[in-house]
Structure formats: C-alpha cells, structure tokens
Amino acid sequence: RNLMIAQQYVHDHVMHFYHLHALDWVDVVNALQADPAQTSAIQQSISAWPNSSPAYFKDVQKKVQGIVDSGQLSIFANAYWGHPAYKLPPEVNLLAVAHYLEALDAQKTFTKIHTIFGGKNPHPNFVVGGVPMPIDPNSDTALNAERLSIIKDSIDRMIQFVDQVYIPDLLAVAPYYLEYASLGEGLGNFLTWGEYPDTDNDDTSKFLVPRAVIMNRDLSHIEEPNPNDFEKMKEFVSHSWYEYAGGDNAGLHPFAGETKFNFTGPKPPYEQLEVEQKYSWLKSPRWAETPMEVGPLARVLAMYAGGHKQTQDLTNFVLKTLGAPIEAVFSTLGRTAARGIETKVFADYMLDTYNGLIDTIKSGDTDTFNGDKWDPMTWPSHAEGFGFMEAPRGALGHWCVIDNGKLSNYQMVVPTTWNASPRDHKEQAGAYEMSLVGTQLAVPDQPLEILRTIHSFDPCMACAIHM
C-alpha cells in the first residue's frame, strides 16, 4: 500500500509541475526563439539526462512551430503567451517545453505499480485492511518475480526522472522568479494527518510524514492533532451554501456533520460574488477554529521540524542554491519547491520499501490484507470509522457513521476543502484567499500572477465539493 501511495505522489507531482503549473512560468511560444545548441548546453550542465543534444531540442522546436503555424495551439491553448510577467530566456523555455512533452510519455512507466497492485490507474483498487493483489511466486495471476521486476524498473525510472529532469528544472526556473519567494504565503498555519506507517496506522510515531499542527510558522513547537477531537476538528458553513440545524455560526465535527443545501447566490450570468454573504459550495474546515494550509509545504515542514535528515538536507540545499533565507519556504516558490523536495524523498522511499517487500516475501510472509472486519455481523450496532491519508494535495479524511449495518452519515474533508475554504464564522479567510493578499497584476485581464499562486496549491475543486 505504501508503494502505491508513493507512486501516486511521484506521478501526481511530476504531472502537476509540468502540465498544470509549469506553463505559469514557461512561455511556450517564446521557445521558438531559442538556440537549440544553447539549450543543449544548459541541459548538459544541470544533469546527465540523455535527451540533451542540439538535434533533439531542434526537433522539439519544430513540433512547437508546427502547432503554432496550424493556428490551433492544441494542448498549449488558453494561456497568456507573451505576458510581461514571463521572464525565462528562450533557451530555458525550450528546455521546459521538451520536458513537458517527455513527462506526458513518462506516465506510461509511472503508472505500472498501480496497474499491478491495484488493477488500474487512475483510481486503483484497494481493499479494507490492505491491497487486493495476492503474492504467489508460482502464479501467473499474482505478484510474482516477473511483476516484481517490472515494479523495480518502474521505480528506477521514476527516480531517474525526478533526479535528472524534475529537480534540475525546478532549480533552473526558480532563479528567474525569486520575487515569489516572498509572495503567496497565506496563513502560516499547517496541518498533516501523517503518512507512510511503518507498522500500523495506530503507531503515528513510526510515520515517515509526522501527524502535525504548526501554528504561526513556529517549527519549534509541533502539536499532534487528533482527527476525532470534537472540540478542535470542525467544519463551518457561515459563508457556504449549506445550513446547519444549529445555525450559521455552529461548527460540527465530521462525525456529526450535516450537508443540507442552501443556495443563496446570484443567478447566472454574474460577474462577482458577495463575499460578505454566502459565496461558496465549499465548507470551512478549521482546526481549533483556525484556518490551516495542507499539502506538500505542510508535509515538508512537518518532516523538517521532525528531524527527517533527507528533508532537511534537500530543503537547505534548495535554499542555498537559490540564495534564499529559510523564510522563503513560506511562499508560492517555497510551496512549489516543497512539492519537488517531497517527490525526491518519496521516490527514494519507494526503493527502500520495495527492498523491504522483497525481504518480507523471502521470509515467507505473503499476507496482503487483514479481513477481520469484512463480515458486517462482527460490527456493533453503532460504529464510527475514520479513514485518512496524506493525498498529494494534502490532508484527507473520511468520517463514517454506521447504524445497524448501514451508513447513516458520511463526511469527507479533503485537501482543497481546507485550502480553498471560504471565510468562517470569525471572518477568517482560507489559504487561497490569504495567499493572494498583496498580489499585483501586470495585465488586469490576464491574471497570470494569481494563477501562479493558486496553482502552487494544486487545486481540485471537483474533490472539494460534496453534494
């Protein structure tokens, strides 16, 4: 299961950087002005990635030229090419565009672990208490030596791409946008539920990613949150299109959560929302009545503060390379760098976990799940369950209540619900809103600067709204 989760991280973060975020910084059309020989020299100076010849980059340039000449920009449509906020030289733009295309192809390799263990990607199959793939070296339909070899090759290729493409590209692009090392912070409060248990979910001390609450940037004081604390873990709907029986100022723990629609917004078409009223389909999750940021930056800070040496070394290396102070991590650029840092940590972790799996199989332990709770007859008449993980976008929790064998309540609090939440009963804004305070636009009707910060969170509005 840890291998499947780690694979999702590496896949998701690489795809996010190149296909959902990089083009906020990279001007694709400007890459046509590049000298492929100079791009080749840049590539060879930053990593040993084999696709580095002038001819290779010339071919990429021809592909882009063909798209532009067609008059239909295809995958590169709906952008602000030529915007004055783009600062990369043409040669770095060409480098990034080449890797954008390579990352599309790399997905075929990245997803093999999900396909083998979980049957498909996206949305691989899990089972309660483990994973569905049996282990049998002598079976063609189970996890055997051939499939283990495919998994090992996939891990090696992911590590190579992260080491030789993703991280070098981050460090090649970031120096041109150092002003974003002091923009886009937001809240300064961070939350993680923790991830990658070494033994079981109850022993949080063995998690690779600690369960942590960090308040006001204070890395010297880490609190371990209890997701089932009815006093601290609450959702509010003061500015959401829902209503609670206890009124708009009430906060409810997810076990007692209510989802009753109360749309009071304007009828389309409209140009703006009345933010002093209800204005969002998202609820407002709060920890101790405080808005929190979740996601890669929260996890990197938790690991850094918790003494995880590789995270500390990587973070310090990035800051030193960019000539930035530690405070720079609390920013749009810091959030983007954190995603790369944890991708490197989790890619390396996959190799260690794979080796541990091999040792476990050799010892004769081939169990892949615990089915003790599968029979509903073993359940009490009233039961409450909490499932959690650190999804790539951040802390994810599902709370369910079961009465007489049937679900009587089910509430989800997902990463984007935390980050994109509207104001709460105390008029406290969520992470997205706060991160945009002070943002200035070079071209008001082309809000590239806003996209850079919002995309640094990796939004998923479809995940965040539950109707």
Predicted regions and their residues:
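Active-site bordering "gate/hinge" segments
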Residues: 1-393, 404, 409, 414-467
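A translation/RNA-centric and nucleic-acid-associated enzymatic feature enriched
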Residues: 398, 403
